[in-house]
Amino acid sequence: IELGRSFVTLEYQSSRMGTKGLFALDNLWDGLGALTVIMPGARYFFGKFTMYPSYDRMARDMILYFLKMYFSDSESLILPMHPLSLWHDESIFETLFVGNDFKQDYRTLNREVRNLGYNIPPLVNAYMGLSPTMKLFGTAINDEFGDVEETGILIAVDEILEEKRVRHIDSFAQKHP
């Protein structure tokens, strides 16, 4: 199942709409969970997340380094034709992250990105929290879509965390046997 581009319009983002906007992204996940029930043969979510050229380079590099550290595709299933390189030397990040404790390194990432005045993009957070075995395929610039930086990902449906499975898949399956 392709994870297409998704965008929650500013009108429905929680900071502007209070509780009405709080569940907008959650509803997108409910829809994807429903698709796995309707299409039981679907084995993977495949797609990308986008970061804009205006996003802080240090924050972007930290996020991409972190994702590569925890979700790297060791099989080289898909490679960008023109991979995006980090602007900063990786040695900066090697000392920042422990490398063997996802939760601790995530807290560090979140703190450091916030210290730069940014947040980890919501979809990046959502994908990281969906499956510990997500595969990251690298990042490339899409020169046909405003030079955005797109990072390919793959998530195995059968490896979605139990908490997310119950919330977004099992809940739909119970209501629609």
Segments predicted by a language model, with ranges:
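Acyl-donor binding region in acyl/amide transferases
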Residues: 1-134, 138
